[in-house]
From Swiss-Prot:
Protein name, entry field: tRNA-splicing endonuclease subunit Sen34
Reactions that this protein is recorded to catalyse: pretRNA = a 3'-half-tRNA molecule with a 5'-OH end + a 5'-half-tRNA molecule with a 2',3'-cyclic phosphate end + an intron with a 2',3'-cyclic phosphate and a 5'-hydroxyl terminus
SUPFAM superfamilies with a match to the protein in the record: tRNA-intron endonuclease catalytic domain-like
UniProtKB keywords: Lyase, mRNA processing, Nucleus, tRNA processing
Catalytic residues, chain numbering: Y253, H261, K292
Subcellular location: Nucleus; Nucleus, Nucleolus
GO biological process per UniProt: mRNA processing; tRNA-type intron splice site recognition and cleavage
Chain segments carrying region Disordered: 120-184
Any single Gene Ontology cellular-component annotation: tRNA-intron endonuclease complex
Amino acid sequence: MLVVEVANGRSLVWGAEAVQALRERLGVGGRTVGALPRGPRQNSRLGLPLLLLPEEARLLAEIGAVTLVSAPRPDPRNHGLALASFKRQQEQSFQDQNTLAAEARETRRQELLEKIVEGQAAKKQKLEQDSGADEGGQEAGGSEATQGSETSDDGQPSAEQEGAAPSLDSSSPQPGPSNGVTPLPRSALLIQLATARPRPVKAKPLDWRVQSKDWPHAGRPAHELRYSIYRDLWERGFFLSAAGKFGGDFLVYPGDPLRFHAHYIAQCWSAEDPIPLQDLVSAGRLGTSVRKTLLLCSPQPDGKVVYTSLQWASLQ
């Protein structure tokens, strides 16, 4: 089961796989609020953690898809231990990378060893052929005299000939085991970036039915109103997100927000609350100007939700 950490009314999802599962299987997108490690000074693209609306977190808890837990408060006395643990893990990662790099280089060297030996043999054979061709062009008498001086009476090669052979072999590189592998510089090593945070050991389950410091939404009329509408739209197959900058409660999408634009700006109104005409006109004009339809949502005592769509039509 997925885990959602709740602290001070904010519901956070820290795992990348959990975020993917919420979007693909449950139709809950949330909003990323974390800075990217390689782009911390911008806010156009954000990363983990994922911030859920209170209505999203409650819905997931009600259907049994997630477990809400209260995140433990950080203890400043443990910061030094956490930093030391992080540095140990980083050093271990660097050592593992150097070990893998050395193994890869040794494997590559073994693959090329046969080609190196063949190349050395071909080079040696070519030098011997060139030397034989030069000697064949000399006079027969001179060749016999030279041959007689290089060999002794018993047919053994002379000391000069013995010394020439190893000098030929030493002129070309000899394949053999490496005496050692130079470690990679720190600038060439990769720094592992965590994509998830382990579940806190001391985390305790959170009851969303009871109001607490971490979950102050329980029992609030505004939250109950928004939740009833959110769940009804979600059960109809819509994706929803926050719509604060559009003057509404939710943006309603026909599918994944990564593929579709929002079609509606949902405003939640209680059935007995009057709607000021000025707010109604301004919301309708705003929705039309951004090519969206204003959706007035009001839950009824029998549990059903009444929807009224509104578009502003200018005078012709």
